[in-house]
Each structure stands twice: as C-alpha cells, then as structure tokens.
Amino acid sequence: FILIVFLPNGTYLLWKLENTYSKPKIFPDKIDGMLILGSGTDPLLTDQHGQVTLTESIERITESIELIKKFPDAKVVYSGGMPTAKSQEKLSGVDVAKMFFTRMKIDVNKIIFEDQSKDTYENFIFSKKFINNTDGEKWLLVTSASHMKRAMSVAEKLGLNFIPYPVD
C-alpha cells in the first residue's frame, strides 16, 4: 500500500495510455481523408478577448495543418462541437478552429466542419456521413495520444477504420 501512494502511478498510467498507438512512420501512397477530433480551443476566452485562445490539446489542430499540407487532396473533416445549453459560450469549438485555420492560411472551404457533437461518440456519429472508409479508403484519425485508445475503440464499434495519428 505504501508503495502505491509514493510511486508516480498516474504518470506511468498516462505514459502507458499515450504510447498505445504511435504515429505512422510510413504512410500509404494515398491518404483519402483525415478526421480531426476537436479540442484545443477555448471559445469563451476567444469571445471575451477577441483573439483565438488555445488550450493544452492544441496539437490536434497544429499537427493537422502539417497533414493538410502533406496530403492536399485528402478530404478533411473537423469534428468540433457546440456549446452546451448551460454554457456562456457564444462561439463553438468549430468557430474558433475556423478562425485559427484561417489565420494559418488554410482554406477553410476545403474542410468539412461538424459542429453538432458533444463527446467522442457523437464525433463519430455526426462525422460518419462524411466518411466512406469501408471500401479500402485510407483515413487518418487525429486526436490526443491519451484519447486515441478510446477514440479508436468507438470508431471500430461503429465500423469505421482509421490509421491512428496521435498527437501531443
């Protein structure tokens, strides 16, 4: 019992979770699409300060910029979310992501923004209509490394196949 209290178990467990999947070292010849699970933005502070405010999960967006440039013909779906009814947010995560992509000179007209989801399961449910990867299409799933195991599990249960691309 004493060892459990004094050892850095949380750090080890997070490390183990984050290392379940690794970034692909070699990509297929063609990437047909990528699904970016939203996070990394702070809509409330963005609205209050009038500037894009980012959070600790920003790598989901920043890394996706490199992927969009690397695979310019790939379909891109950003699954963000909407403010909850109790929230004071006037902007959604999708609104802030659009602002950020625009500032980074990414054409937001080439990105499909899904803005109805409120959790991981809904990310896939609402994005599924944009994704056709059951016929051998190669799609990347971009999300935080600590979130990837859960996201891949949900995707698999819904019959969606992805190449994991964990970030952060």
Protein language model annotation of sequence segments:
Residues 3-168:
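A structural signal for short, hydrophobic/glycine-enriched beta-strand patches
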